[in-house]
């Protein structure tokens, strides 16, 4: 709830009105039949959550694409990345958004066949929280995913001696980054082999 503004006037003009609205909201959620963790029906609610995000992203137009990858695209990318594999050590998405690509890997391979879990990084706090909620709603145990809220290009959080066996991503296209404004970036082991940094107006090339 870190990015939830409980003092927003959209909830009501006074503190009492806002509290009444929040109580009503929580009671409404409490009364919903969301499925039981033990019988795995909670996964159906996760699918509904992704469907609603997809509808919202569609209505939001270009901005919606910042956090949501359509199911068809997620499935194609993940199948290409997992051809010939029945299990992998771990899956990574450096621009994970709401986590749709990570979850598609869980669905295609089976979550138990991703031995060390699911890893991702997302720069936007709200989208980062959406991703974590999405993981829980799809029955991914807390100790099987590691989502970080940082700028992947400037502050990668998932350095490891053992490389990721599968990397899937739909990075933000045509966004800006520091590029050669920060001369130390050329020493980054991810960029150094190229001998040049991606243009400041083409951060997507830095992801590649």
Locations of regions flagged by a protein language model:
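Mobile active-site "lid"/loop adjacent to the S-adenosyl-L-methionine
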Residues: 174-206
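Short, solvent-exposed loop/helix junctions and linker helices
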Residues: 19, 161, 201-205
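Generic detector of short, locally flexible boundary/turn motifs and exposed helical patches
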Residues: 13-15, 40-43, 55-57, 111-114, ...
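Glycine- and acidic
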Residues: 58-63, 114-118, 191-196
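Conserved S-adenosyl-L-methionine
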Residues: 63-169, 174-176, 181-185
